[in-house]
């Protein structure tokens, strides 16, 4: 059995949590398989800034954002499911923006094959393993995570958990979040990417035309 991170791990500042989640592995039990993905991209959100759902106020649908750190907040984005974890402070959370399919003794090649069946490409063909979770809705589709099942729930070590498997990014890229409308704090650098996996995330922050110090920053391990 995998070992789940304790709930108190998530009860920390959203930016700290967003950085600390990089390299951790999400595991979801599907039948007798543990589907798994290594987190490579996260975004932090605060109640006090305009880019967050919580800034729009408390509703029953958003209640997970206002619960203790470690609650699951899921919603629909562009027709697909999205996964967030509540952080310290009411209304603060981390969006799991993308991940990289993970295999080990717990989550083997059969689990990877199931993820590929869950998330074919637009033509119905098998999606390459490195692109299976390259976006927030692709991630949830590959792992089989659904809003009605997991929204406002706690982790269940028998079904859904986040595990520390000893993977720590050597460098982290800090940059602006994606899809934030103009005038809603789109300038805030609350997006964090494992530099070693930058080309596999939602949008590569190191792509041509991006300038270090203007468009992104490098955070060395421990910063």
From Swiss-Prot:
GO terms for molecular function: alkylbase DNA N-glycosylase activity; DNA binding. Keywords: DNA damage, DNA repair, Hydrolase. It comes from the Bacteria. InterPro entries: Formyl_transferase-like_C_sf, MPG, MPG_sf. It is an enzyme of class 3 (hydrolase). GO terms for biological process: base-excision repair. Its EC number is 3.2.2.-. HAMAP family: 3MGH (MF_00527). Belongs to the DNA glycosylase MPG family. This is Putative 3-methyladenine DNA glycosylase. It comes from Pseudomonas syringae pv. syringae (strain B728a).
């Amino acid at each position: 059995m995998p070992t789940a991170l304790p709930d108190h791990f998530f009860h920390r500042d959203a930016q700290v949590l967003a950085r600390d989640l990089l390299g951790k592995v999400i595991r979801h039990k599907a039948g007798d398989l543990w589907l798994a993905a290594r987190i490579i991209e996260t975004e932090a959100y605060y109640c006090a800034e305009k880019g967050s759902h919580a800034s729009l106020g408390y509703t029953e649908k958003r209640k997970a954002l206002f619960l203790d750190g470690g609650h699951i907040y899921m919603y629909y984005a562009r027709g697909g499911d999205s996964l967030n974890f509540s952080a310290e402070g009411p209304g603060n959370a981390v969006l799991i923006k993308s991940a990289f399919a993970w295999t080990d003794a717990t989550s083997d090649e059969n689990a990877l094959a199931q993820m590929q069946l869950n998330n074919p490409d637009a033509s119905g063909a098998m999606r390459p393993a490195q692109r299976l979770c390259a976006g927030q809705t692709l991630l949830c589709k590959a792992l089989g995570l659904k809003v009605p099942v997991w929204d406002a729930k706690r982790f269940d070590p028998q079904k859904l958990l986040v595990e520390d498997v000893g993977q720590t990014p050597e460098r982290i890229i800090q940059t602006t979040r994606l899809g934030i409308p103009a005038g809603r704090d789109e300038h805030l650098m609350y997006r964090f990417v494992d530099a070693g996996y930058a080309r596999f995330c939602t949008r590569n922050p190191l792509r041509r035309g991006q300038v270090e110090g203007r468009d992104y920053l490098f955070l060395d391990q421990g910063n």
